[in-house]
Amino acid sequence: LRLLLTTSVLRLARAANPFVAQQTPPDPCYDESGAPRRCIPEFVNAAFGKEVQASSTCGKPPTRHCDASDPRRAHPPAYLTDLNTAANMTCWRSETLHHLPHNVTLTLSLGKKFEVVYVSLQFCSPRPESTAIFKSMDYGKTWVPYQYYSSQCRKIYGKPSKATVTKQNEQEALCTDGLTDLYPLTGGLIAFSTLDGRPSAQDFDSSPVLQDWVTATDIRVVFSRPHLFRELGGREAGEEDGGAGATPYYYSVGELQVGGRCKCNGHASRCVKDKEQKLVCDCKHNTEGPECDRCKPFHYDRPWQRASAREANECLACNCNLHARRCRFNMELYKLSGRKSGGVCLNCRHNTAGRHCHYCKEGFYRDLSKSITDRKACKACDCHPVGAAGKTCNQTTGQCPCKDGVTGLTCNRCAKGFQQSRSPVAPCIKIPAINPTSLVTSTEAPADCDSYCKPAKGNYKINMKKYCKKDYVVQVNILEMETVANWAKFTINILSVYKCRDERVKRGDNFLWIHLKDLSCKCPKIQISKKYLVMGISENSTDRPGLMADKNSLVIQWRDAWTRRLRKLQRREKKGKCVKP
């Protein structure tokens, strides 16, 4: 009653929610947590429904007992692998053998590698006196013996009838005198177990020899010699040489079975047909191939291995930090890592390099604000073509190798105590020694400053007339200062250019030269790390590259409110509103 109630509840649940009945069953190749584990296809009769090639079949020409053209009296090879029952046993039958010896061969192609557990034959005639079973692992190209049956093992097959099986010979075919009796005259059985009596069968996972031994793509059965009816009063003389009075014989088999599993090396739970209708494993664990016998591309961090009960031995992806699509396996690196990792990335992208694409290639450095897996993890060094001694920078800091006297991350300016030269070999040269008497070092203003100039007022107004009188109008940031002879040399960064008659004046680092007397009289007044509006006249000087400013120049601390006004004046100048003074 309880079982009936449970069944009824399940039916109601499926009717209410069809999804309950359609849920995908769990994948046997992974446990409940998603971790890989060994999986194997179901055990099947691999011979069922397969075509069997027989070297001899009765019915052509027709005889009293066999006619290939009459389905009721035909005994084709298809009967060997069809559905047989005890009540309806269909039998294949060979031609009548009038002359002996006469071998009859049955060849079965499994269509794929199988791990064979047994081969069995159920006879409709008396069992043969001598039978040999062979297997092929290369789809019938070559054959190796699997098992012999004979009452005369040494005479027929050159094998002893009772050989001892050891680990040294467990992959060799044996010969037995069992299962060769004449009786029963029908329904007799020959059953060969591939692992029976093999010493390593208990540890099959660790025995490559036995794994190879049970593998087959084709099975061949050779009936070498039938029973001669001496015991039933048959002739002895002339029987084996096919004398005129020899008794006729034939072989007849009702069922050929090959029990085993699709060979998938523990990496698939089933076999399916591919686009060409060939049987292949439905591989998991990042494996591929008809038998899951190799790793998928990019999963070469460790060598392919067969799965075992203890280890799934799944193929692992190479660690390339998302910068490569291909890799290869290196056994030496794998051994050095303690058999943990042997993958080597190929063709690293995004300016990366290394076995794992884990550092930047030459000419680039790491942007530590981004993950190593980011496409922009490596930035170009951008070393100055003149100031840098090479194109390669420090891969951690990005610092380029600077020439003597050059400084900056990209080697784009002269260091303190050096001045720019015209030589690309030595772009910065040391400033020559200065005569102390010619340098104004006092911070006090000279006595004649009042008559010399007047400092600029803070509320200075900019108009079109003053704008037009100047050769350049720029916004600058004062970086540092050094003295050269009677001049103060300021390293500046030009932030904006509002007017310029000299094409060399561009945004970026430059120099501003002011005579020391002008600076001492605070005409103009300048402080380091401040922003200024500079309006002045261009003066070409080979000794002093950059901008020049004097007591007549306008150098006042920058105000953001001027931006709009200066852009307006700039537009008016382009329209021709400036009249040349």
UniProtKB/Swiss-Prot annotation:
Query: Which residue intervals define the domain Laminin N-terminal in the entry?
Result: 35-261
UniProt key word Acetylation: no
InterPro entries found in the cross-reference section: Laminin/Netrin_ECM (IPR050440), Laminin_N (IPR008211), LE_dom (IPR002049), LMN_ATRN_NET-like_EGF (IPR056863), Netrin_domain (IPR001134), Netrin_module_non-TIMP (IPR018933), TIMP-like_OB-fold (IPR008993)
A Pfam match is NTR
Laminin EGF-like domain location is 262-317, 318-380, 381-430
Where is it found, in Gene Ontology cellular component terms?
basement membrane; extracellular region
Q: Which cysteines are joined by disulfide bonds?
A: C91-C124, C262-C271, C264-C281, C283-C292, C295-C315, C318-C327, C320-C345, C348-C357, C360-C378, C381-C393, C383-C400, C402-C411, C414-C428, C449-C521, C468-C578
According to its UniProt entry, the protein's GO biological process terms are: animal organ morphogenesis; dendrite development; motor neuron axon guidance; myoblast fusion; regulation of DNA-templated transcription; tissue development
SMART domains xrefs = C345C, EGF_Lam, LamNT
Which keywords label this protein?
A: Disulfide bond, Extracellular matrix, Glycoprotein, Laminin EGF-like domain, Repeat, Secreted, Signal
Q: Which residues are glycosylated?
A: N88, N103, N394, N540
Specify the NTR domain's residue ranges: 449-578
Motif Cell attachment site: where in chain: 507-509
Q: Does the keyword Transcription apply?
A: no
Cell compartments where the protein resides:
Secreted, Extracellular space, Extracellular matrix
Q: Which SUPFAM superfamilies does this one have?
A: EGF/Laminin, TIMP-like
Q: Where is the signal peptide?
A: 1-15
Q: What does this protein do?
A: Netrins control guidance of CNS commissural axons and peripheral motor axons.
Name listed for the protein in its UniProt record = Netrin-3
Q: Which organism is it from?
A: Gallus gallus (Chicken)
